[in-house]
């Protein structure tokens, strides 16, 4: 962790007070499984927290920066920014993958550069930063790493199928869209998810993905295309 601490200080001016917290953020579930450590020792809880912090900061930035855009447009922009591919790229740009503690099996299967793993790592780091130093530092970090790409429009042109589906269905009148994870398969370090999207209780489509977010996006895409099957 000393090399990581040095990198964070040199690149972002960050010095973690709680090194164990930082270590947890960079601990994959495959590592804790192989080492027979408690599940709470991996980064999944921090990922949950970081996901919320990231969404809040991005939402606040978009709201203040684009006063002319409607809610639907802002939602579409935010979804494009926080999607799996985008967050994985942010994680790569920070060089985080090098410091991730992985199990040997996951390492051999290329887990260190798997997009969902890097996405989760980026969110876990934000969660750890929030606990260690508060929301202001999280905001500063996101402004340094993420916001420049938003200003360059790098991540706001990607199709967000969930928002697109909502817009299509709303044309036909009142609608209640919901998503449900139908199935989880595979070991903890290499999960696959099957999601379904419903409108007013009627299933419209299913999707398969390596994360719940990806599976839901795929379900929405299949619903738009009229494909009521897993793909």
Swiss-Prot record:
Keywords: Cytoplasm, Endonuclease, Hydrolase, Magnesium, Metal-binding, mRNA processing, Nuclease, RNA-binding, rRNA processing, rRNA-binding, tRNA processing. Residues 160-229 form the DRBM domain. Its EC number is 3.1.26.3. Gene3D superfamilies: 3.30.160.20, Ribonuclease III domain (1.10.1520.10). The gene is rnc. Mg(2+) binds at residues 47, 120, 123. It comes from Lactococcus lactis subsp. lactis (strain IL1403) (Streptococcus lactis). Its main location: cytoplasm. One of its GO terms (molecular function) is rRNA binding. It is an enzyme of class 3 (hydrolase). Digests double-stranded RNA. Involved in the processing of primary rRNA transcript to yield the immediate precursors to the large and small rRNAs (23S and 16S). Processes some mRNAs, and tRNAs when they are encoded in the rRNA operon. Processes pre-crRNA and tracrRNA of type II CRISPR loci if present in the organism. This is Ribonuclease 3. PANTHER family: RIBONUCLEASE 3 (PTHR11207:SF0), RIBONUCLEASE III (PTHR11207). Residues 5-134 form the RNase III domain.
């Amino acid at each position: 962790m000393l090399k990581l601490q040095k990198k964070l200080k040199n690149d972002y001016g960050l010095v973690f007070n709680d090194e164990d917290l930082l270590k947890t953020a960079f601990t994959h579930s495959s590592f804790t499984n192989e080492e027979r450590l408690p599940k709470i020792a991996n980064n999944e809880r921090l990922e949950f927290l970081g996901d919320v912090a990231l969404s809040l900061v991005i939402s606040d930035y978009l709201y203040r920066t684009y006063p002319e855009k409607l809610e639907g447009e802002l939602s579409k922009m935010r979804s494009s920014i926080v999607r799996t591919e985008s967050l994985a790229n942010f994680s790569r740009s920070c060089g985080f993958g090098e410091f991730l503690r992985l199990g040997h099996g996951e390492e051999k299967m290329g887990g260190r550069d798997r997009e969902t793993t890097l996405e989760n790592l980026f969110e876990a780091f934000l969660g750890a930063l929030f606990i260690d130093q508060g929301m202001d530092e999280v905001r500063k970090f996101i402004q340094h790493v993420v916001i420049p790409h938003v200003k360059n429009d790098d991540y706001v042109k990607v199709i967000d199928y969930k928002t697109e589906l909502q817009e299509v269905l709303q044309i036909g009148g009142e609608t209640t869209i919901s998503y449900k994870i139908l199935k989880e398969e595979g070991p903890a370090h290499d999960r696959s998810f099957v999601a379904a999207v419903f409108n007013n209780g009627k299933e419209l489509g299913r999707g398969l993905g390596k994360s719940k977010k990806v599976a839901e996006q795929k379900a929405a895409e299949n619903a738009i295309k009229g494909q009521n099957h897993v793909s």
